[in-house]
Structures are given as C-alpha cells and as structure tokens.
C-alpha cells in the first residue's frame, strides 16, 4: 500500500471509514504509526464512553453496548464492540499506547441511518484512501444529500436541541410516576392514528438529514475547541460525515460553541455475546475478524517496538490481506471434509472453486467474495456437505467468555433475547443476504441438540444392528475384488492398438509388436481410453 492512507486538514489527520470493515481498521492502525497523534477523536457519543472502553478492554470477547432513554425499553440502540471496526480499533490503539481518546459525537434518540449499498473497500489497497473517498464523494447520491443539508442546515441548532432534550427528559420524569401501563385499546388507537397520518418519505428523509446536521455541527464544534490544544489529531469518522464537518470547520460562524454535558442514558448495559452468535454481530466474515485478532497479537506493541527499519515496519502492518484468508477457508474446509466423508477434492476442483467464486464476485460488482459467494461456489463445484464445512469454518469465532461476569444476550437476525427472557428489537445490519439459517443456499442439515447426542443414540441402538464384523470384512473384500475386476475388464475393452508414428501414447504394446516384428518390423503402441 504505497498510496496515502489519510486525508489532512490543518492539524487533523482524517480517516473516513465504513463501519465494521477490517480494511479501515488496518488503515487506522497504520496511520497511528505514521502520524503519532496527541489525540484520537472518534465518532461516538461521550455519554457511553466508559461502557465502550470497558467493552474494548475485554476484547477479543464480543460485547454489545445497549442503551435507551427509558428504564424498561422495548427498543434498544446498541453499539457492537466489533474488533474489525475502525472506531473500535482507534479506541483500542489509544488505550494500548496511552493516547487520549475523545468521543466527539452527539447522542441522539433512535438514530437509524438509511441502508445503502457500499463499494468494496478492498480497492483501498490499490488506489489509496484519498482517491477512494473522492470517488464516493463525487457520486450523485452524496452530492444530492449534501445539497439537501445546505438547504435546511440554517434551521437546525445544536443548542436548541439540547434545550428541548432537557425539557423532554424533565417532562418524562414527571410523568413516569403517574402514568399507568397503556391498555391495548390505547395502543390500537395510536396505531390507527399513525396509519391515517401516513407520513411521506420525504419528511422522513428531512428528519434524518436534520439529525445528521446536528451531529456534524456538534462534532465540528468539538474539533474547533480541540485544534488549538493539540498538534496532531487523528480523526476516525464515517465516510458520509467528513465533507460536512469540513464545511463547518471552514465556516465556524455557522455553528455555535456548544459546551453542554450530554444527558446520560437511563439504561446503559454491557452484554456479553457468545462466539456462536458472532455472525449476527459482525459485518465481516467471522474468520476474517479472527485472523485480524491473531494478526494484532502476533505484531503486538512489544513485537513492533523491536523493528528498526521503517519500510519493514509498514510492510508488516500492511501484510494482513483478506484474499489470503479466503484461500485458507477453502483449504481448511477441504481438510475437514476429506477427514469426515473420506472423499478427496483434487487440485483441479479446488482451482475451479477459486475461479467460480471469483467470477461470481465480479458479477455482483465486488472484488472479494462474501460468505454467500463462498457457499455457492463450494456447493456447485463439490456438494452441500463441503458447503456446510465452508460455512462452519467461515462462521467460527473461537473466543468465548465463560466467566459469567456479564449477562449474555442471545442474538438472532430478528433481535436479542436477554437472560430474563425479554425480547428486544435490535438494528443489526450484516453482510449476509439471508435472514435465517434455513435460508442458506444448501440443504438444511440437522444439528445436535447437545454435543454427543448422535453418538449417544448410536451407543443405545448399536446392538439392534444386524451385523457381524468378521462376515462384514469378507463381504467388503469380495465387493472390492468384484469392483476392481470389473474396472479392469472395462479398461481392457477400451484399449486400442495402433502403429507407432510420433507418440508412444500409453506405452508399447509388447505382444502385438513381437507378433508382427518378424515380417513387418513395426512397433505398436497402446491407446488407453479413459472410462
């Protein structure tokens, strides 16, 4: 990676990112050693600072920071502590090297960004971050979005938002003691009223844009306050926000000097996530995230401090490549498949799997395959059993916290189940195009209810099986002899004897050559046709 890895604005070194993508986490770690910042600023609200740091400190175990405005929430906002996320990597690096980390974002109620298809971030390795960002910023979608922001930004005030938020909180606290549980009739009336209002999509868009403007003004205000105090600031922020933040930094008169402590949430909790649920929390294939964790361990602070040559230092930092891990997934699955099913996958089929997954990826306008492309390639070239092995290897996340220090939330694609049996709706967005395990592109395979269930059933019923090993061995040897004899006969029938001209083909036909040598003095060869 010889290209620039950051965007510089005065004394701020910016890494615009896509969240939960390991390529951007790699950029953050590389840029730390290029910049050696006095301060790291991240796009997270300050009123969950301690919980996020606690979650980062317990990595590689996965955590989920859930927070809400009420004490008994039905809908939770959450921040996944994803090891492959660039913001989490920035916080982790700051804690590791004892660099101050500032959370500069504004906390908003029920903030939900609209979904969108993102380009493949693997291209950063070839074109560099500034060029990658420039291409995205020039897209019509982002140009139109920025134009909408400029139209309504004058009517959006961060200070007014804080004042309204404080009043809203006070009003809610006064009503909490008096309000009773809403009846089903009231809920139905509310739903009917909401259905009659039928808000327009444009209004939803404006509300979302207003929230983005509030956040960007608040982040710009914090950066303006910090810039005179530090020589080098490393800023890790979402790709869609930097252009507007830069605009407010260039026009400081358009933002207020906001110096208000954000109101803490009434419900903030750290949940442990089991390794088996990692695929619901991580956007990257869990195997990629696992390899990133192992890479960081191998080249930890102690190991990197021993490297003296700068070129060798950055070559090591950039040596993590997802493309090599895709090969490892297929090869590891091949080994497990051959061990369990006693069927061999030859090099030709393995090469075909690589080519198939590559071509399938290109047809989906991507550079590297996601899990879906890996499964389709494995299924179509080999079979469903091999595809299941690929799924198991790719989805495996080996780090599981069994200390029970934190409550564990069970995750699905629909939401999360707390230990007390309370179902909460979450807003996870991952890269898999299916919603349930049954939607995988393979025949569904039953799972054991508990480890060793099938072995236990076999031990219970093994004496009911009509079989006698000595006789079985004799029968199997006889079947093997018949099979071998049949193949030999078929092979002999497909041998053609030809006169030697330019090629020995499959060897000299000794009998035919000797038989005709006395009067023809010609050599004959065998042409064995495959069965």
Segment roles from a protein language model:
Residues 1-531:
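Compositional signal for N-terminal targeting/processing segments
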């Amino acid at each position: 990676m010889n290209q620039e890895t950051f965007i510089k604005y005065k004394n701020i070194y910016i890494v615009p990112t896509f969240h939960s993508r390991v390529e951007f986490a790699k950029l953050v770690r590389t840029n730390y050693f290029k910049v050696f910042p006095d301060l790291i600023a991240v796009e997270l609200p300050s009123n969950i600072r301690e919980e996020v740091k606690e979650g980062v400190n317990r990595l590689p175990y996965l955590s989920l920071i859930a927070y809400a405005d009420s004490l008994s929430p039905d809908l939770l906002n959450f921040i996944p502590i994803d090891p492959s996320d660039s913001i989490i990597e920035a916080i982790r690096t700051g804690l590791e090297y004892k660099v101050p980390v500032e959370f500069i974002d504004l906390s908003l109620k029920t903030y939900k960004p609209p979904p969108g298809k993102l380009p493949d971030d693997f291209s950063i390795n070839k074109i560099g971050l500034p060029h990658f960002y420039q291409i995205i910023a020039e897209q019509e979608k982002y140009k139109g979005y920025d134009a909408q922001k400029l139209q309504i930004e004058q009517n959006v005030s961060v200070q007014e938002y804080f004042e309204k938020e404080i009043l809203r909180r006070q009003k809610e606290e006064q009503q909490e003691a008096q309000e009773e549980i809403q009846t089903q009739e009231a809920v139905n009336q509310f739903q009917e009223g909401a259905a009659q209002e039928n808000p327009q999509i444009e209004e939803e868009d404006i509300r979302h844009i207003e929230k983005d403007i509030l956040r960007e003004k608040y982040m710009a205000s914090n950066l303006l306050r910090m810039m005179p105090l530090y020589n080098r600031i490393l800023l890790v922020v979402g790709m869609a926000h930097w252009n507007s933040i830069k605009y407010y930094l260039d026009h400081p008169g358009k933002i207020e000097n906001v110096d208000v402590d954000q109101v803490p949430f009434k419900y903030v909790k750290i949940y442990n996530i089991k390794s088996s649920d990692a695929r619901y929390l991580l956007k990257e294939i869990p195997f990629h995230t696992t390899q990133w964790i192992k890479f960081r361990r191998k080249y930890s602070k102690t190991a990197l401090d021993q490297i003296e040559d700068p070129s060798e230092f950055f070559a090591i930092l950039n040596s993590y490549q997802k493309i090599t891990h895709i090969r490892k997934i297929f090869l590891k699955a091949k080994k497990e498949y051959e061990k369990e099913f006693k069927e061999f996958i030859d090099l030709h089929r393995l090469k075909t799997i690589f080519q198939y997954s590559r071509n399938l990826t290109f047809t989906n306008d991507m550079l590297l395959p996601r899990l879906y492309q890996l499964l389709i390639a494995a299924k179509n070239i080999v079979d469903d059993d091999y595809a299941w092995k690929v799924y198991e290897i790719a989805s495996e996340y080996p780090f599981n916290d069994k200390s029970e220090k934190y409550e564990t939330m069970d995750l699905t694609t629909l939401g999360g189940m707390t230990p007390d049996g309370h179902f909460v709706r979450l807003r996870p967005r991952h890269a898999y195009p299916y919603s349930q395990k049954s939607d995988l592109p393979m025949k569904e395979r039953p799972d054991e209810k508990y480890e060793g269930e099938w072995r236990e059933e076999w031990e219970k019923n093994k004496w009911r099986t009509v079989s006698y090993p000595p006789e079985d061995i004799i029968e199997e040897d006889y079947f093997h002899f018949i099979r071998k004899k049949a193949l030999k006969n078929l092979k002999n029938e497909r041998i053609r004897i030809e006169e030697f001209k330019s090629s020995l083909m499959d060897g000299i036909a000794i009998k035919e050559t000797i038989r005709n040598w006395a009067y023809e003095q010609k050599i004959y060869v065998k042409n064995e046709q495959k069965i």
